[in-house]
Every structure is written in C-alpha cells, then in structure tokens.
C-alpha cells in the first residue's frame, strides 16, 4: 500500500477518468520507487571545505545600450519621429541610382537645407566606415540577419564620435560599401515577362538596412550624413565618388574649405597582414590576428589626401600593424621623358613632343599581333605608336567576333594596308590563325607582348571605365573572371610560332601629367 501511495504522488499527469491501477502500473511504480528511494549523498561534515563554492555571476560586457533595448520594446506609436532623411543619387544622368544617402538632424537642429548651407563650415572631416568600424552584428555572425542585429563595435564609439562633433569641431561622416544591396530591380531580359531578375530577398535588404542605419544615427544623435555605395561604380571605395558627393552636399568646393591635414578616415580595410602577437610568458601559443580583406579604406584616404587609421588605432589606441598593397602606386610614379633632361620635361607639352620610340616598322606591309591581358595598354599603344605609322586596327571588342576580325584583317591586307590585331591572343592555338593568314597573304607577322601585371591591368580597366576622358570607346569595366581566364590560358609567345620577332613591352605609365592625375589614384 505504501508503494501505491508513492505511485499516486509521482503520476501527476492529468487524466480524463479515474482508473484502477493495473499490473503495468505497478511495474512502472516499482521502477519509479526504486529511483525515488535510492541512496542519497552523505551530508557534508562540518568544517569540510573541500566542496567548491558556487561560481560568482559576472555581468557580461556589452556594447548594446539601454536605450536600444528600451527602443526595441517601445510600441511604434510611442516612438519618436525618425530624424533620418533618405535620398538616392546616380553617378551620371544616364545611370540608375546606386548611392544611398541618409542625413540625420537631431531634434531642435535646423532643417536639412539650413544645416547644409550654414555659413559656419566645419573644415575638419572625421569620416568612418560602418561595418566592423562603428558597429558589428550583435549575433556574432559576419553579416546582420535583420535590422535589429547590431551593436556598437566598442562601447566607447558613440561617445568618441559625439566628442568629435560637440567638442573638437569635426563634421562626422560615414562612408560604407554595401554591394549586397540593390536599390532597384533589374529589368527582365525577356520582353514577355514582367518579373524582375533581382530576387525579392535581395530587394528586402534595403528597408532592413535603412531601419538599422536610422537606429544607429538616432542613438548617436549628432548631425551627420551616411553614404552607402551599392554599385561597382565611382562611388565604391576606394574611388572618390562618395567624398565628392559629401563635398557638394556641404558646399566644400574650394581648396581651403577642408582642413585635409587634420581630417581623417577610419576603417577596417587597411591591408593589414596576419600577425602572431607575443606569447603570454611563452607558455600559451598566440592566435594570429586575421588578415584584412582589402586595403580600400586606406586607399580612399590616400586618394582624397587625409590621414588614415584603423578602428583599433583610433578607438583603442593600439599600435599600427604592418600592411601591404597588392597594387602600390609608389612603384609607378609619373615618369620624366627618357629622351631629354629638359627641366620642363615633365610637362604635358614636353612629354607629348618627345615621345618614347617603342616600335618601328620594318617592312612595307606587316601584320602585328598584340598579346596581353585586358587592360594591359594595348589599344593605347596602338593609338600612340602604330596608328601614326599607318597601321589599321582590328579589335574584337568593336567587331564582336573572331570571324569578323579575320575577315576585316584579310580585306585590309588585300588592299595593301598593314594591320594590328588588338586582341588578347593568349595561347598558340589562337595566334596560329593569324600566323597562317599572314603567310597566305605573303606578309611578315610580328608580335608585341605586353608584360603588364594582372593587378595593374585591373587598375587600368577601372580607370578607363570610370573616366570618360580616358575612355574614347566608352568601354565598361570587366569582371575579374576576364583577367583570371586570360591568365589560365596564357602561353608565352615564341618566335618559333612563326613570328618575325617578338617585342616585349614592360608597363610604365605613358601619358600626360593631367592623365596621371586621374591614373595615379587607387581605383580597385
């Protein structure tokens, strides 16, 4: 009976009707009784201090402010008005908008127009990247999964920015690349379909991003502007487009309107290399600090002529780490003319008059085959060195197919003209068709090999695509795949392929000083 009583106490699950216990119930109750009535631990003897005390609960440090938590639980009807104004901008009149601009004006401040056009201009700019510089994800993931998934990168960030604005006279600006955002759906390639090519999930990221940025700016609560580049155009860091828009928005047009010496850009993309910090007493193996994903933030600061620091240097006072650039402009300075020691040889007029001779015609009629990756400088070389010698040009970017190139070259040769094949021609199989054409037409075939490093080619391609004065054929920028594809197929050209000679051209900037002002910035 005692065991039955215990069973009733254990089996507290609700039932719809009262049933008498069955043998099955007694079997279960016996099992349960064995567990309940098992041996217990002996009581600790008095004075026994071998038992550890319970662990102390420590309050975890967090960068999430109390106001953020309060705002999250506040009903929408009771939340203050959003002080952030959003606009969109295009790189030119013929392109869609790719730049998101958020202007925040605290309550009680002048209106947007008045704050921008104020007669008292702040000459010092403190510009910051957004992700991994001012904020990071609260979830610990690489990318925020929703608008609320963020926290300050370090708890000192908001107070430091407020001090810059309120006490040190800086204008605080935010520049961020947001390539994962699409402002407007791409039109469908099919005329019969009205559905956009851009996935809906990608379009949904824009309102989430706006909501997150509005919360960040609201907590910061100082007059500021955030610029978010969503395309691979002039706005994307390290390109200067966002900086130029900021200058226009704040009426900073004159050379002395900005104190460049005391202005600064802070961002995590500094080209830092992975390093092993010193071990702790030599006993614990140190963990390597990760390598930066790019050098775009450091390069933007270089392009606009201001100081650069990483978040660790600016907010935490850490010492700078070593950094490298895949493409370093230091290796490609503006050259003086190699044919003269005239003090004015660096001027555009002098360099154009005394052009370096890199190619000479050796026969009345020739077929010249260019070999080199996209952006190696092949077309520029033609215009400056071979066109003046009377060569006609065949280019697949213009004619759109190899067959059309072969047909055009054949017609030029039949008319007695010399021809340049201005294509990449990476491998012997591709070059063989042109060697056979030259033999068939009875003209010598020569090769000019452009030994331009791939990273310089990518730089040249970006310079050409983003600057109309240097893009007479209005070419668009190429994907990285185009450069990697050439590299995978490339075989060094040899005289034994049938060439009369192979002229090697190493890259160095050849152009006017005005052109170098554009070329001599970081574009990738």
Model-inferred region functions:
Residues 377-378:
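Conserved glycine(s) of the Walker
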Residues 374:
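The conserved Walker
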Residues 142-173, 185-186, 193-214, 236-240:
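Short, acidic loop-to-helix structural element flanking the phosphoryl-transfer center
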Residues 389-446:
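Conserved nucleotide-sensing/catalytic segment adjacent to the nucleotide-binding pocket
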Residues 441-461:
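Conserved phosphate-donor/acceptor-positioning beta-strand/loop module used by diverse small-molecule
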Residues 370:
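Hydrophobic anchor at the beta1->P-loop junction of P-loop NTPases
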């Amino acid at each position: 009976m005692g065991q039955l009583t215990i069973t009733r106490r254990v089996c507290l699950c609700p039932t719809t009707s009262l049933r008498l216990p069955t043998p099955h119930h007694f079997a279960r109750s016996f099992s349960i009784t064995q567990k309940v009535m098992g041996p217990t631990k002996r009581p600790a003897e008095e004075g026994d201090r071998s038992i550890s005390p319970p662990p102390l609960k420590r309050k975890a440090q967090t960068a999430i402010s109390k106001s953020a938590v309060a705002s999250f639980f506040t009903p929408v009807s009771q939340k203050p008005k959003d002080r952030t104004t959003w606009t969109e901008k295009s790189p030119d009149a013929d392109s869609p908008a790719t730049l998101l601009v958020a202007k925040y004006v605290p309550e009680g401040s002048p209106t947007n127009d008045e704050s921008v056009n104020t007669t008292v201009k702040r000459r010092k700019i403190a510009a910051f990247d957004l992700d991994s510089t001012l904020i990071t994800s609260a979830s610990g993931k690489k990318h925020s999964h929703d608008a609320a998934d963020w926290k300050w990168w370090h708890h000192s960030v908001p107070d430091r920015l407020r001090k810059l604005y309120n006490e040190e006279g800086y204008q605080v600006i935010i520049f961020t690349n947001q390539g994962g955002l699409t402002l407007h759906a791409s039109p469908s390639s099919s005329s019969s379909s009205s559905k956009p090519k851009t996935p809906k999930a990608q379009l949904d990221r824009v309102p989430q991003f706006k909501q997150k940025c509005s919360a960040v700016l609201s907590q910061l609560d100082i007059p500021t502007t955030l610029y978010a580049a969503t395309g691979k155009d002039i706005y994307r860091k390290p390109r200067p487009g966002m900086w130029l828009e900021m200058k226009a928005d704040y009426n900073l047009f004159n050379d002395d309107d900005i104190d460049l010496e005391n202005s600064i850009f802070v961002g995590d993309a500094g080209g830092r290399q992975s390093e092993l910090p010193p071990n702790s007493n030599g006993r614990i193996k140190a963990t390597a600090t990760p390598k930066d994903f790019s050098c775009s933030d450091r390069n933007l600061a270089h392009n606009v002529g201001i100081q650069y620091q990483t978040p660790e240097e600016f907010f935490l006072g850490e010492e700078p780490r070593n950094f490298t650039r895949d493409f370093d402009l230091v290796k490609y300075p503006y050259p003086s003319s190699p044919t003269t020691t005239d003090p004015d040889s660096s001027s555009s007029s002098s360099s154009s008059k005394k052009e370096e001779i890199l190619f000479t015609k050796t026969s009345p009629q020739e077929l010249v085959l260019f070999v080199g990756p996209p952006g190696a400088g092949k077309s520029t070389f033609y215009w400056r060195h071979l066109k003046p010698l009377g060569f006609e040009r065949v280019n697949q970017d213009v004619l759109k197919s190899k067959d059309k190139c072969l047909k055009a070259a054949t017609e030029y040769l039949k008319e007695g003209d010399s021809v340049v094949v201005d294509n990449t021609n990476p491998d012997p199989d591709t070059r063989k068709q042109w060697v056979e054409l030259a033999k068939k037409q009875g003209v010598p075939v020569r090769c000019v090999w452009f030994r331009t490093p791939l990273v310089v080619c990518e730089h040249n391609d970006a310079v050409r695509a983003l600057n109309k004065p240097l893009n007479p054929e209005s070419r668009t920028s190429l994907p990285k795949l185009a450069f990697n594809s050439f590299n995978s197929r490339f075989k060094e050209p040899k005289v034994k392929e049938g060439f009369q000679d192979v002229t090697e051209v190493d890259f160095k900037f050849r152009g006017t000083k005005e052109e170098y002002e554009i070329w001599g910035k970081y574009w990738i």
